């Protein structure tokens, strides 16, 4: 379980410095893993018989296209599927659009997700996105999608109008902002959509798990923007194998309780001890991932649950 896909956040550097960026990426960001280590990781993932999909994101992965292509060429002989996430800045050059799509098609890229909305617009022209979407029609085997982060005051409807016919047939997803990264200080809370509350028990479940090797060197159990501000890491040593990472994901008691009992288990403990405000848990939220971020964003908070988790273990597993 959880061993068929893996994601790598290559670099925090980006051509943009968006107000909503979960990583607070910018042209001056320098946080990244060493290239040789990334090469070793990708080689390990490519050779792993259980991994089917390898995903690359950033920062902006196309800023160092030579390195990105090198990594994809490492993977190609092993016939793994590749997915990419980009803000599409490179679409301004039709020559690059042609080159990159030709390479992606030959290197088994099955999906390209473009992140573009009103927050990206100051840094990337809509014509760049339009060029990418229009050219993608020549490559039906590459699934193109457009992801748009939105707030109440910036729904990006005029962006869709600017893109015109180029969006026909393209999967478009608008998703509400999560207050993490740059958004914590640059996006007003009243502008963030909040569909759920702590009273909605059906919303208090973790939506899923994907192993992510982050550019800060940590290994995280999912790809939600909020997870990168928590202390839930699967890393125990530098040369940790992928098999060991999967083992840690499956055996971690905190994550097991999340999968089995949901966030309600942790929230009930806080309610019983009048700790909801102390843990800064939002009553209303756009995504349960924001609650996760508040629950586990410090070692002290995680340690608070240890006695309860130990009791849970003794009651459910200890012989």
Curated annotation (Swiss-Prot):
Coiled coil: none annotated. Disulfide bonds: none annotated. The keyword Magnesium does not apply. GO terms for molecular function: 4 iron, 4 sulfur cluster binding; catalytic activity; metal ion binding. [4Fe-4S] cluster binds at residues 14, 18, 21. It holds the Pfam family Radical_SAM. Its cofactor is [4Fe-4S] cluster. Residues 1-214 form the Radical SAM core domain. Binds 1 [4Fe-4S] cluster. The cluster is coordinated with 3 cysteines and an exchangeable S-adenosyl-L-methionine. InterPro entries: Aldolase_TIM, Pep_rSAM_mat_YydG, Radical_SAM_PqqE_MftC-like, rSAM. Keywords: 4Fe-4S, Iron, Iron-sulfur, Metal-binding, S-adenosyl-L-methionine. Required for production of the modified peptide YydF. May activate a metalloenzyme (Potential). This is Putative peptide biosynthesis protein YydG. It comes from Bacillus subtilis (strain 168). The lineage of its organism: Bacteria, Bacillati, Bacillota, Bacilli, Bacillales.
